[in-house]
Each structure stands twice: as structure tokens, then as C-alpha cells.
Amino acid sequence: MFLIFSFFLFVQGYSQNSYRFKADITIKVKLQDGTFQYTKGSVRYDRNYKKVLYSTFFPQKEFYVSVDTLILKYVNDKLVSVQNNPLRPELSIFHFILNNDISDFGLKNSNFSITNVEKTDDLIITKWSPPVNPKFPFGTILVSTKNKRLQSVLIHNKKGEILNRQIYKKYSFINGIEIPSEILSVSYLAGVKSYQIIEFGKIQINEQGHDSEYDFQIAKNKL
């Protein structure tokens, strides 16, 4: 459900001032009949604790924790499921935002390398190529920027087929960093195209206090 916010990069380095992200979140998933399924709630992330926390209140009240390589789901304060997730929280869009790495999708500090740059009108399109590694699951990534703002990301598999396209819109300038408040994502899996729109509202950077809300304690014997 929330994997859209993460991919696979290997990012290091930190922005000195920003360490916490909090926002209301709405996820719209387009169904085959053209209607949308809505999920509404909030999201929190502290890069020191490295846990992405989602609280939903619609269509039902649920709580999700993305930690390490797991996603835990809670209903009525009870752990109901644990799923593997190869995309760690420190590889999420929230981490990129706090590091001020979002303009290049975190690729500058990854093991990808620039292999081509094109300029078309007011867009700069940068082609990032993956390392030479037969086990690496992804191919090239095209990143489009306008006035140093991330506009879109196009992710391919090793065969050159499109896996995912993301469009970033409605930027706000908060605490010295550019933050998109709307992301359109189109995924292509097994020949099926799926659409998601992710919207952030009431974005806060560096909320003070409330440490327990960012560092949710997980009972090890429950995993």
C-alpha cells in the first residue's frame, strides 16, 4: 500500500537542519471502472529513528510501521500482520526530502552514475545508469527537473521496460527545502497499468516533542 514512497537507492549524507517529517496523507487508487478508492490518514518519519509510521482513519482505522525490512500492520493496537519489505525507511521519499536530495531522487549519493543529460525547453533530463551487477534488479532511471525542482521520474527494469512513472507537483518551500504535496504514480506490472495519486497536507518539518509518536516501540517477541 505504501511502497510507492520508497525505491532502492543507497543514500548517505544529511541535511543539517531537517530531521522530522509529518503530514496528513490521502492516497487515491484508480480502479478499473474509473472510480477512485481513497485512504486517508497521517504519516510521520524521523530520520534518527528510521521508522515510517502511517495512521489511517478512512476507510478504516489502521496503523502501519515500516521498519528495517518489514511492514507491520496494527488494528485496535493489536499486531495483525507482518510483511517483508526490501525498501528500508532510509530509502523513502521522506528521507530524501529531509536530506534535501529529492531534486535528483537521491541518485547523486547512490551507486548509479550519470550517462546522459539532455535539455529540452526548460527541462533537464538526466539519465542515470545502474552499476554493472547481474543481480541488480533495476535498469536506467530518467529524472526530469525544472528550475532545479524534480518534475518526474521514469524507472525501467533491466530489459528497458517501464516499471514506474512518477510526477511531482504542487511544491511548497518549508524549512529551507522544496517539498512536493502531490505525487502521481503509474506502475506497470505484468502488463497491468495502475494509478495512484498521493497528496500531503499540513506538512510539518521538525515537530518538537512527541518522540514516542516517531519512535514506535515494537515488541520483538511479536515478530
Roles of regions detected by a PLM:
Residues 1-20:
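Bacterial Sec-dependent N-terminal signal peptides
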Residues 27, 56-57, 74-78, 154-158, ...:
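Beta-turn initiation residues at beta-strand->coil junctions
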Residues 35-42, 63-68, 160-164:
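Amphipathic hydrophobic-ligand
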Residues 46-96:
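An acidic-aromatic
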